[in-house]
């Protein structure tokens, strides 16, 4: 296999973890003129959520935000015609290498083939993210690890009973995200990190234990019924 370079861009925290995006070497200079962040898009029909990378032109401000994969497609392949969309072939929605992008008609669905855990662990995204050190911001400023909460429209809301909070597996390379609210197992010690299964939780423990702090739940008084 010929050696090649990739860019790994930090997007910030969303869905309970720090997210990164992969880009081709030729697109690395974009970091000079764009800022990047992760955003969650919640399916209005209740079919879970997806996380995408957004790019913001530094000269135009926050109003210039757009999906990174669409920006890259237009730079290298041309405009997206009405009735078409750009999708990620491997279903990893932050793997924005050009080889992983494809233009398809709206309504297109990939083959219903379940990606085995073995295939997932051998994917380029998995291998790349697995090599990253622990996020220094998580290690030095754990108080800043605030999870964003989203409603059904994908808008950030305060923590409240009717908010829809989807989590992605806390193990950095894993991109499995909850299809239903509170679906994943939660770390019994900190009550924050969530995992798609015991295997990912075990793999994440060497890094997670450095800033996993036992959470003391406040005692809640039950309200007496009105008479």
Swiss-Prot record:
| Entry's localization field | Cytoplasm; Cell membrane
The question of whether Cytoplasm is a record keyword is answered with: yes
Regarding the membrane, this protein is recorded as: Peripheral membrane protein
Question: What keywords is this UniProt entry annotated with?
Answer: Cell membrane, Cytoplasm, Membrane, Metal-binding, Zinc, Zinc-finger
Mapped zinc finger ranges (MYND-type): 174-212
GO cellular component term, pick one: plasma membrane
Expressed in which tissues: Expressed in brain, testis, placenta, heart, liver, skeletal muscle, kidney and stomach.
Q: What's the main place this protein lives?
A: cytoplasm
A GO molecular-function descriptor? zinc ion binding
Please give the subunit comment from the record: Interacts with GPR24/MCH-R1.
This chain's function reads: May be involved as a regulatory molecule in GPR24/MCH-R1 signaling.
* Name of this chain's protein: Zinc finger MYND domain-containing protein 19
The organism of origin for this protein = Homo sapiens (Human)
Q: By which gene is this protein encoded?
A: ZMYND19
